[in-house]
Swiss-Prot record:
The keyword tRNA processing does not apply. Disulfide bonds join 113-136. Zn(2+) binds at residues 131, 171, 297. One of its GO terms (cellular component) is extracellular region. Acts as a glutaminyl-peptide cyclotransferase. Responsible for the biosynthesis of pyroglutamyl peptides. Might be more efficient in the conversion of tri and tetrapeptides in vitro. Might have a relative preference for substrates containing hydrophobic amino acids in vitro. Residues 1-23 form the signal peptide. GO terms for molecular function: glutaminyl-peptide cyclotransferase activity; zinc ion binding. InterPro entries: M28_QC, Peptidase_M28, QC/QCL. This is Glutaminyl-peptide cyclotransferase. Optimum pH is between 7.0 and 7.5. CDD domains: M28_QC_like. Inhibited by imidazoles (imidazole, benzimidazole, 1-benzylimidazole, 1-methylimidazole, P150/03, N-omega-acetylhistamine and 4-methylimidazole) and cysteamines (cysteamine, N-dimethylcysteamine and N-diethylcysteamine). Partially inhibited by PDB50 1(3,4-dimethoxyphenyl)-3-(3-imidazol-1-ylpropyl)thiourea. Its EC number is 2.3.2.5.
């Protein structure tokens, strides 16, 4: 990913998911209802935290693990495989992994991250713990800890489904450019934009237009991360994360006293897997730590330098956010910059 310099003005908040005052007081009950499963999280992270450059054996193993995990969690799983020429290696096979609950739903909440690790010719052992093994583990662990809700009350809803997207080929093989980056998300966005579903497919919206918001996780796992709002149209969703964190902290459900989610709009953007979706007018909630962790793209981005209290805190806030979004969803949410 890369930091850009696009500046925009915030026109106000879309307070879609802010907990009402009585619910703020009982946030601890929500936090207790959906308990941590650290055994699952640690096992998941261990399975992903290996060198996984596109085309490597480790990459293939992690891909298979993601498919197996999604199937085991009750998702309908699809592998979006394609070949493309890249710098250094020539032609490689990429594979996005997508899991869906309620695939026939009108709209979707999409949670995403990338699973490939960066290629360093002088560091074949680079594992990219924050970039993005931990985000992968967070998505699977969120599905696991919310499993009782997702597999019973939520299943077969027609208004909203849940997508977990594990992008391949986010990392540049040489230097970050529009061409040498986000290979998987470009392919998947184009595929979703070209297809429609339903018995009257010609009249149906494009599949990409059924995504209400793409929530993209990246660079998570270091000590005391900070998350700002990047896009005006999803600032209300970011504000809900701020409020959930505050409520859980008040209820004694979080560790330490460092706030992760900041009530501020960033003056710059971070280029990442969301770019092709943003180009297709998909609302994006970009949860990337800024400033970047000091271990970013160094050999120190490994398990030894992860900060477990920060990871647990993020997991708890994010789990509640996902649950509240799905639980309170009653009608389509259109946050697009222009209407479709």
């Amino acid at each position: 990913m890369a930091i850009g310099s696009v500046v925009f003005a915030a026109a106000g908040l879309l307070l879609l998911l802010l907990p009402p005052s009585h619910q703020q007081a009982t946030a601890g009950n929500i936090g207790s209802q959906w308990r941590d499963d650290e055994v699952h999280f640690n096992r998941t992270l261990d399975s992903i935290l290996v060198p996984r450059v596109v085309g490597s054996r480790g990459h293939q193993q992690v891909r298979e693990y993601l498919v197996q995990s999604l199937n085991g969690l009750g998702f309908q799983t699809e592998v979006d495989e394609f070949k493309q020429r890249v710098p250094v290696f020539g032609e490689l096979t990429f594979a996005n992994v997508v899991g869906t609950i309620n695939p026939q739903a009108q709209n979707f909440l999409a949670l995403a991250c990338h699973y490939d690790s960066k290629y360093f010719p002088n560091d074949p052992g680079f594992v990219g713990a924050t970039d993005s093994a931990v985000p992968c583990a967070i998505l699977l662990n969120t599905a696991k800890t919310l499993g009782a809700y997702l597999q019973k009350e939520f299943r077969n809803r027609s208004d909203v489904g849940l997508m977990l997207i594990f992008f391949d080929g986010e990392e540049a093989f040489k230097e970050w450019t529009d061409a040498d980056s986000v290979y998987g998300s470009k392919h998947l966005a184009a595929k979703l934009a070209s297809k429609r579903s339903g018995s009257q497919a010609q009249l149906a919206p494009r599949n990409i237009d059924r995504i209400e918001v793409l929530v993209l996780l990246d660079l998570i796992g270091a000590r005391n991360p900070k998350f700002s709002s990047f896009y005006e149209n999803t600032d209300g969703l970011h504000s809900s994360l701020v409020q959930i964190e505050k409520s859980l902290r008040t209820a004694g459900q979080l560790e330490g006293n460092n706030n992760m989610f900041l009530s501020r709009v960033s003056g710059g953007l971070v280029d990442d897997d969301h770019r092709p979706f943003l180009d297709e007018n998909v609302p994006v909630l970009h949860l990337v730590a800024t400033p970047f962790p000091d271990v970013w793209h160094t050999p120190r981005d490994n398990a030894a330098n992860l900060h477990w209290p920060s990871i647990r805190n993020f997991n708890r806030v994010f789990r509640n956010f996902v649950y509240q979004y799905l639980k309170r969803h009653t009608s389509p949410v259109n946050l697009r910059f222009y209407r479709t």
